[in-house]
Amino acid sequence: MTNATGPQMAYYGAASMDFGYPEGVSIVDFVRPEIKPYVHQHWYNYPPVNPMWHYLLGVIYLFLGTVSIFGNGLVIYLFNKSAALRTPANILVVNLALSDLIMLTTNVPFFTYNCFSGGVWMFSPQYCEIYACLGAITGVCSIWLLCMISFDRYNIICNGFNGPKLTTGKAVVFALISWVIAIGCALPPFFGWGNYILEGILDSCSYDYLTQDFNTFSYNIFIFVFDYFLPAAIIVFSYVFIVKAIFAHEAAMRAQAKKMNVSTLRSNEADAQRAEIRIAKTALVNVSLWFICWTPYALISLKGVMGDTSGITPLVSTLPALLAKSCSCYNPFVYAISHPKYRLAITQHLPWFCVHETETKSNDDSQSNSTVAQDKA
């Protein structure tokens, strides 16, 4: 069976078996000879997965790609169409949308083709490296743009008008820094530090976190620090202090109202409480989604590079990568389309979307800080 070729479905249930593969068939048996140098020896220990996994993952990736094109494309379109959205903060958001859009449009078509055309990598070895590099650049860039967005929100909400203002120039610099960090983290394998190889069920390519040598170990520790640990610290720091600042502000207002012998300084206390709850929930959702998407892949990579490859099966390796790529679908909705100003732009420029957002203005100065906080969060 070592020379088996063609779709894996043809071998599923062979040799008088109702389910599974004949004994001795490896997941690597279906890989073309010129691709095998890009397959780590670890995967030779596993039989192919049920072919239905390939079809299921192909359908899921097609869905993710469609949602990403719609969501991120809409954000980019509205940014270019509406002058009101072309703010410094939204420069970061539109770069996030661009990065996410590139990730899905450069990865999804090839992954789904592999899923439906044989269940293994069907393209050249060189494009395996390009595929992995593009996924790394856009993934890391999105992570750091989320850090920049989180820090901007922290600066606005915690420092208010006393903090340094985010100008268009600064926003462009922050976006460029994110792209430079991403490129700097993704290019080393082309120069001998680390490797890009096939991973999991061999439908896609990514970092090599299985080879046990100092070269691979040092590169993976480098990307773990710059792609996960530092961004996680910045995002958690930002949102923890955002929530603390909001509740401290509300406590100060209640104390001031008590000194003035009034029940509240607000015209509508119920609305204020709802705004506080919304801000806290938004912060919790932002942090939780980030960790849900990126932590499994980071832990699997760290487990492999530390030498413990037990339990890293083809599916265990593949599913965290799916979670990581799914962030490109929710980002445009969490960071842009859910915002009232984006919904207003949809109402104005795409009325057939049936989004009916009305422009509101508040004249109550006592609510200014919370209004800014609610918009930014």
Curated annotation (Swiss-Prot):
It holds the Pfam family 7tm_1. PROSITE patterns: G_PROTEIN_RECEP_F1_1, G_PROTEIN_RECEP_F1_2, OPSIN. The chain crosses the membrane at residues 54-78, 91-115, 132-151, 171-194, 219-246, 282-305, 314-338. Keywords: Chromophore, Disulfide bond, G-protein coupled receptor, Glycoprotein, Membrane, Phosphoprotein, Photoreceptor protein, Receptor, Retinal protein, Sensory transduction, Transducer, Transmembrane, Transmembrane helix, Vision. Residues 79-90, 152-170, 247-281, 339-377 are cytoplasmic. Disulfide bonds join 128-205. InterPro entries: GPCR_opsins, GPCR_Rhodpsn, GPCR_Rhodpsn_7TM, Opsin, Retinal_BS. Belongs to the G-protein coupled receptor 1 family. Opsin subfamily. GO terms for cellular component: membrane. Expressed in all of the seven retinular cells (R1-R7) forming the main rhabdom in each ommatidium. Glycans are attached at residue 3. One of its GO terms (molecular function) is photoreceptor activity. It is found in: Membrane. It is a multi-pass membrane protein. Phosphorylated on some or all of the serine and threonine residues present in the C-terminal region. Visual pigments are the light-absorbing molecules that mediate vision. They consist of an apoprotein, opsin, covalently linked to cis-retinal. This opsin produces visual pigments with maximal absorption in the blue-green region of the spectrum. The modification N6-(retinylidene)lysine is found at residue 325. The lineage of its organism: Eukaryota, Metazoa, Ecdysozoa, Arthropoda, Crustacea. One of its GO terms (biological process) is phototransduction. This is Compound eye opsin BCRH2. Its main location: membrane. Residues 1-53, 116-131, 195-218, 306-313 are extracellular.
